[in-house]
């Protein structure tokens, strides 16, 4: 199976030179693969029937012998081979799913579907707790959380950014700002129930972007403190380069402070996958002082 996969992957050079493949690109790629490999016999009871594309899914079809039996861990093996070859990352970044179909005498014997998000090698493990207590930018806030393993931990380079975790084009930042006054948790819950206030805040929060879109928002609790969770996307420019970015943010009202847990990255499949990690980090947040009794 590994040999078959590596042979097929030789025809994927087109992907390496494209930042983001459209459905039309994927269709053309499938036609190329089909033309090159159709009818190829691998000599082990498996021959190539063809390849085609459905939307963002590449479908590989094979003819197998009557006594062919799919390996017990065939899906795991296929994903492992895609990762080892380096093409899993390309599929993942371009949001390309793959499906493998095996036929005997035009009857489907086995079908394995692999979604693009299953092809990420991202690490979703968290490290040991770190605390911002005593940090000059923390403004007296006592907060601790678990950073993502394998990410670079740096000090914030702007006045209110306490710390940031970095991985390629992605970041998770801890930002602390002064609020206008002290608010109790009940007062904040009442404030966040005001739809006009929330909409105005979201409009202000996305104003630094061109063509901003608020993708979703909801009221949640972060370690018992009422918070506004929202995701937005839009366009921005840096040193002449235009890009579409996404941000996921938790705005936590903590007494007389506002804490922003802000995650950002390019609008791609990687950001979508990392949202799970961002949720895990935020769910690890603890405000220790509320338990000192």
PLM regions with names:
Residues 69-92:
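Short, non-transmembrane amphipathic alpha-helical segments
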Residues 24-48, 70-74, 136, 142-146, ...:
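Start-of-domain marker
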Residues 59-71, 163-196:
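A short acidic-to-branched-hydrophobic micro-motif
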Residues 49-50, 120-170, 219, 241-243, ...:
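N-terminal targeting sequences that direct proteins away from the cytosol to non-cytosolic compartments
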Residues 20-66, 92-133, 217:
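Polar/charged, Gly/Pro-rich intrinsically disordered segments
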Residues 89-92, 99-114, 239, 252, ...:
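Short, exposed beta-strand-loop hairpins at the edges of beta-sheets
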Residues 3-18:
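Sec-dependent N-terminal signal peptides
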Residues 124, 199-252:
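Signature of long, low-cysteine stretches enriched in small and polar/charged residues
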